[in-house]
Amino acid sequence: MNSASFLQSRLISRSFLVRRSLKRYSGLAKPYTFQQPTIYALSTPANQTSAIAIIRISGTHAKYIYNRLVDSSTVPPIRKAILRNIYSPSSCSVKPHDQKESKILLDTSLLLYFQAPYSFTGEDVLELHVHGGKAVVNSILKAIGSLHDRSSGKDIRFALPGDFSRRAFQNGKFDLTQLEGIKDLIDSETESQRRSALSSFNGDNKILFENWRETIIENMAQLTAIIDFADDNSQEIQNTDEIFHNVEKNIICLRDQIVTFMQKVEKSTILQNGIKLVLLGAPNVGKSSLVNSLTNDDISIVSDIPGTTRDSIDAMINVNGYKVIICDTAGIREKSSDKIEMLGIDRAKKKSVQSDLCLFIVDPTDLSKLLPEDILAHLSSKTFGNKRIIIVVNKSDLVSDDEMTKVLNKLQTRLGSKYPILSVSCKTKEGIESLISTLTSNFESLSQSSADASPVIVSKRVSEILKNDVLYGLEEFFKSKDFHNDIVLATENLRYASDGIAKITGQAIGIEEILDSVFSKFCIGK
């Protein structure tokens, strides 16, 4: 083993010890969390009546709970669905089959038992698939809780938010990025969010982050070899300038990769929060009708009276897998005697400034009012900026083909080819599909995603660590152009970046506060 390889192995030992502490029981009957209390909770939504509810139990006493609930001394079959009666433990003898006539039946349930370490948490896990009535669920949860008896070593408690996922992490079943992917998968509302969450859950981000960390450690090893073995006259470390050059080149390449990744994250965040789509136009051009057509619902009040919509109306819709926050706004006109309407107009302009994409709705039935000057002035203002705009000619069913041609010509003459122009009819639905297709293309461009490529979405925690720890450490490494004069400081900056990645995946030492923050955002039962 050469000096650099030796140093690399020494540098990763800290990470190795952490991983070993997490996974040392992964192949044995006893998981790392063996001595922790057995936990239980409802894994399906609470306070909702449903056909089925799933109660999850995880820990050393899962088999004991099974025996007491079904009044049996047999070992539950592993990974096999069985149908059993569930009884109140207080009505059963500790010795099974005694006093059968006094047993209180709670429900008939489908049971699944997973033996450690081959379960989600890495512990013994028992799942009760019971009927979904609130009374049924509450009675069984109460029955499980009644089995807690610390004096006899039966430490059984109700799970806290994220407890099951925390056990899975502690037993080396998943890293933090995968578990955050599970949470995002549960919370996903659209196809693009689902694809991104599934990518994290499958470990794509984990592999990427681990490769980054390995690159940093390899280059730290090169620098540390110079520090520790400079007096050994080793042939491998004599050409220090070449080593410095290679390390600098490698770290520049890595930094560029992370910056590109962060840019994709920033673009993809729009998918998580929802793309803000605002409809602008003069009064009575059909903005509300278009909102109702796109949402397939009567979100906005439709009337022939100008100024009907006086305030902004937001609605969440799913457009071809994209989460969209669509906003209907008050019609914009220069003068109005109605103070409330003027407030609505002001709010409409502010909403458009905050939007990701604007639909400028025009009415083709009156060429003289086709392009109101006040709206054009707003769209070309510095405040509005260079936002994307699509011109939508509504009410196409009210004009002839020749009249529509005149309208399109006037729009192109005044606006040029800067904005795409589409015609639709909310009455006949003509052009709506074409509009949706154009919107989808813009959404793909805004988020740098497509039907074939998953967007890159990470938690705020991961994003902040990448920025404040990883990139910060790398930038500090470059601050001194002549960094080889202080190799120790340069190496420590790389270590700072490496430790940042370890925080992301959960391999860092002393990360209890990080774990508390991550799992507190999970639901109970997960």
From Swiss-Prot:
Residues 274-444 form the TrmE-type G domain. GO terms for biological process: mitochondrial tRNA wobble uridine modification; tRNA methylation; tRNA wobble uridine modification. One of its GO terms (molecular function) is GTP binding. Pfam families: MMR_HSR1, MnmE_helical, TrmE_N. Coiled coil: none annotated. GTP binds at residues 281-288, 328-332, 394-397. Residues 1-19 form a transit peptide. It comes from the Eukaryota. Its main location: mitochondrion. Keywords: GTP-binding, Mitochondrion, Nucleotide-binding, Transit peptide, tRNA processing. The keyword Cytoplasm does not apply. InterPro entries: G_TrmE, GTP-bd, GTP-bd_TrmE_N, GTPase_MnmE, MnmE_dom2, MnmE_helical, P-loop_NTPase, Small_GTP-bd. GO terms for cellular component: cytoplasm; cytosol; mitochondrial inner membrane; mitochondrion. Forms a heterodimer with MTO1. GTPase involved in the 5-carboxymethylaminomethyl modification (mnm(5)s(2)U34) of the wobble uridine base in mitochondrial tRNAs. Involved in the expression of cytochrome c oxidase subunit 1 (COX1). Works in association with the small subunit of mitoribosomes. This is tRNA modification GTPase MSS1, mitochondrial. It comes from Saccharomyces cerevisiae (strain ATCC 204508 / S288c). The gene is MSS1.
